[in-house]
Amino acid sequence: MSVSGLKAELKFLASIFDKNHERFRIVSWKLDELHCQFLVPQQGSPHSLPPPLTLHCNITESYPSSSPIWFVDSEDPNLTSVLERLEDTKNNNLLRQQLKWLICELCSLYNLPKHLDVEMLDQPLPTGQNGTTEEVTSEEEEEEEEMAEDIEDLDHYEMKEEEPISGKKSEDEGIEKENLAILEKIRKTQRQDHLNGAVSGSVQASDRLMKELRDIYRSQSYKTGIYSVELINDSLYDWHVKLQKVDPDSPLHSDLQILKEKEGIEYILLNFSFKDNFPFDPPFVRVVLPVLSGGYVLGGGALCMELLTKQGWSSAYSIESVIMQINATLVKGKARVQFGANKNQYNLARAQQSYNSIVQIHEKNGWYTPPKEDG
């Protein structure tokens, strides 16, 4: 689809579901992203509204050949199920039809009547006064030509004048040049793999992981060195994460200082591996080094954390929030470095075995949820 065609479609959607719509609102949009809200009346009080349900949509570079990717800021399994069914619905990749299906499903989920405005999504895109499609300015034509020459730059593309919220920052703003170069390298590699018929992963997972990586590169926690991220063999699905700063008052912090003096290592190295169905399944996370005791670290380096299981995972979780939660959990669980321990005891096969065993136990007996004051 051309840039002007995509813009016309997004404008059409935003004109129907504007920021004041009673049921579904498109709060902001760009050529590769939609931020939406679904409003659910409070039970027994139609005039009292709980916080709206927030949905995000990533529009891929190959749209409409490939489907947009939807995810939701909620841990409700019913909502996750709705999005999974949408992912399985391959009949129509057009945003208009996906939006219609999604709104109808959400209305059904919350026992609400189907909103009449969804029928407007079946209409063709509006035409100009002379019966032609909206006129494209020479400036837009020039932009479209640039897009055709270098389509992988779509992630950088921004039309500030079309955005409902003025002053919206570019998705690459706040990212250092060396990290932008990494993102660009990934995009070019993915494009080349696609041309060579050697695509790895899924469009859904790759788009979400690119978004996660951009958010990390932009975050203050990353920039201040609390943690770092490195892609293993340039793979978007295999990360090394270094926890470089932990609570300075913790025994773990003291151990890391000693480890630095002895071995020149002052961090905890984690491995994050992602599957094709991310973000609907959690990443598999394990400690690579150093060998730790306590801190909910299992044999092989796996982590005993509910949020890293299907039972406790939500597609709305960001990877940075997972990293920071692991950091806090290690400290809270009184993790200590095992100096002189056999480093070979941490490996992927053993970690997966420990993880599977602990998941089976907790599926039968449940998980312990600490009081809120314990974090």
Swiss-Prot record:
It holds the Pfam family UQ_con. CDD domains: UBCc_UBE2Q. Gene3D superfamilies: Ubiquitin Conjugating Enzyme. It is found in: Cytoplasm. Residues 136-153 have a biased composition (Acidic residues). GO terms for cellular component: cytosol; nucleus. Auto-ubiquitinated in vitro. Its EC number is 2.3.2.23. Residues 204-368 form the UBC core domain. SMART domains: UBCc. The keyword Repeat does not apply. InterPro entries: RWD_dom (IPR006575), Ub_conjugating_enzyme (IPR050113), UBQ-conjugat_E2_core (IPR000608), UBQ-conjugating_enzyme/RWD (IPR016135). Residues 123-174 are annotated as: Disordered. It catalyses: S-ubiquitinyl-[E1 ubiquitin-activating enzyme]-L-cysteine + [E2 ubiquitin-conjugating enzyme]-L-cysteine = [E1 ubiquitin-activating enzyme]-L-cysteine + S-ubiquitinyl-[E2 ubiquitin-conjugating enzyme]-L-cysteine. PROSITE patterns: UBC_2. Detected in hypopharyngeal head and neck squamous cell carcinoma, in tumor masses and invasive epithelium. Pathway: Protein modification; protein ubiquitination. GO terms for biological process: protein K48-linked ubiquitination. Accepts ubiquitin from the E1 complex and catalyzes its covalent attachment to other proteins. In vitro catalyzes 'Lys-48'-linked polyubiquitination. Belongs to the ubiquitin-conjugating enzyme family. This is Ubiquitin-conjugating enzyme E2 Q2. The lineage of its organism: Eukaryota, Metazoa, Chordata, Craniata, Vertebrata.
